Amino acid sequence: MDASFFIAGRLRFKGRIAMVSIAISYLVIIIAVSVSSGFRQEIRSGLSKLSGDVQLMPPTLNVLDAGHPIDEDASYMPYIREMDDVDAVLPVVYRAGIVKNGEDIHGIIIKGVPRDAGFISDAFPADSVRLPVSIPSRLAEISGLKTGDRMLTYFVGEDIKARQFNVVSVHETMVETDDRLVVYADMEDMQRINGWNPGQVSSIEILLKDNDEEDIVRNAEEAGTLVNAYSSDDDPSVIAVSSVSSYPQLFDWLDLIDFNVLFILVLMTIVAGFNMISGLLIMLFENISTIGLLKSLGMTDKAISKVFLSSSAVLVLKGMAAGNILALVFCFIQNTTHVLRLDPENYFVSYVPVNPDLATILASDVASFVIIMLLLLIPCLFISKVDPAETVRVK
């Protein structure tokens, strides 16, 4: 057994305050990392549901224009579906409308999707309900509409159309991106309202297996290349647009959160490191005679430093474990209860999302542990200044 570790096991590091500080630092670090990951996961998922990761749309970039449909069976679509990262391809029909309920009037966007679309298939009944829609909870709140009500909607164009939709469900909006209220309807109903033939849609949304920003941008470029390469003369003109370019403010905001998390990680690591430095200095002063004795027995400064660094490392690991456990408990409680709420108009989501990614937590733990141990090399310089002749007294 290494003599340094043997001696370290018999030294007592009286650093409860330092250990508490380390535990708090790791608690804050892990929560910050989990919240950042949670925001990114929720907003990506919400945007993917709202408009897909990549959209094929008319060059006008206006999916609400009923005068420029595209073809969901265009000649390039088989190649789009065969892209490696594509998880699903969803044709959709958009139309802006005005909802009137009593004296209340609200502008909405109706998004017609196939009835078998994964996130809406359970909401739409399989029976013969005419013009079923699923409305967002925000619209239900401000208009007073609820499941079972009829929703009178006006469509303004060359001539005004009115339809009585039936509210079959109320869904929670995952991401509040702007003031628009998106109502989900049956795509075939919306095609009839727009006066379109089957196969004509407003846009085609591509959902990816991995919606990381770089993957989204890369797949949008690949989709655009395939469209240009395999379009026929009969296909309407389309362009591929990524959600990153459609909602740059959201991704910029996520990058800002990541920067803040990095700042917190560095700050809390430095705080924990300096608390450990003060604790280690106290330990060195209390054991100055022991240091002198070890030197007189022929132990090198490096070996003696290993003694105290080993003892300090045990304390750091204990604080790390305590902080990690407390952080994971917090994440579990927040994920199950959503006790910490947010204003979605400012934060895009209605509660604090947490996603304790184990790989990220492990990387944060290792990085902060290495930094703290490097900082502890500073007080170890004191060991070289100890003179055995002055510290060891023979009685």
Please give the residue ranges for each predicted region.
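Transmembrane alpha-helical interface segments in multi-pass membrane proteins
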Residues: 281-283, 288-334
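Short helix-loop junctions at transmembrane helix boundaries
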Residues: 318-364, 377-381, 385
